[in-house]
Amino acid sequence: RFRVQSLVLCPTRELADQVARELRRLARYQHNVKILTLCGGAPFGPQLDSLRHGAHIVVGTPGRIEEHLRKGTLNLGEVSCLVLDEADRMLDMGFRESVDAIVSQVPKKRQTLLFSATYPESIRSLSGRIMNRPQMVIAESRHDDRSIRQHFFRFEQNKQRLTMLRLLLHRFRPESTLVFSNTKRETEEGADDLRSHGFSALALHGDLEQRARDQVLVRFSNRSTSVLVATDVAARGLDIEKLDAVINYHIARDPEVHVHRIGRTGRAGSKGLACTLFSASEDYRAERLGEYLGEKIEYETLPAFSLLEKPAFRPPMVTLQIDGGRKQKVRPGDILGALTGEDGVAGKQVGKINIFDFSAYVAVERNAAKPALRKLRSGTLKGRSFRVRRISG
């Protein structure tokens, strides 16, 4: 019987999509489990159609879930399991009232799971309101901070910040870098400045439309873009297998946020690099971070400015976009077969393949981009020809 039995609330669309993907993977061997994602930024109509067909598990963001409840298009009357993922970030984003409104629509007799990277007073208060004698489980970190090399660089004037960012990218030349900025405007300014100086860089923030966000994440995760400049909120839920470097464009306002930022690099036994830029006006934050880490922040000599004359790092991969996706029954194997068929490119030159409802993306090595593009344009997928283009910029 199709009824919503479990509800998972996430702060961002990216995290909701990631959670839904993992749930679908886990449910593969359970017959006919339907998992539905309901997030803002996506059209409302298709969500209504999906709800009419029913679902067992709904994963979504508070704003869109609350909207469906207001319009009477979502019934939570039979939910037996409620999950709040990254609850601290949801409250930071101002979703407290939405969360309370949603919880009021869920039966009181239920299992409630609340996950939070931090445990401030706001989370204690939320737990007290929505949970009944909860058990606290503290997960020990399996991430070894010793695998991360931390560097701090101090400069006098704030107007030097963009130049300092380029200087660090020239100095360390990481293949993939996540730059954390505090505001949407800074992400755009940072990415624009880097592109104007030859870097492959994109911005990620909460105001991007869903299609644009998907494309940004595809290009960064498949290594056809080397620098992603993002806000903390937009970066939540990012699932990047191997991240070479994290750069803090500013020292984080909260020391715990700093630790979570740099913990994205140096995973799975690999070495990580974390660089933090701060101006003289941020000295107090550096002091507070040092107290939190239990060590004095020692800043290093800035790299030589002559490095700015060097060419920027070029990503090893290029992304090709195909105007056909899941709705046209296009699968990764179809794309790989079309690329590597007679007179095609070598299989080892093909990277990550991402399939969406109406489009697909495939990464190929830079030196194979032209023959790969020719091969896809001249061939067919599922017996059909699709428009194919190389994504640049």
Predicted regions and their residues:
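Conserved helicase RecA-like core
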Residues: R1-G393
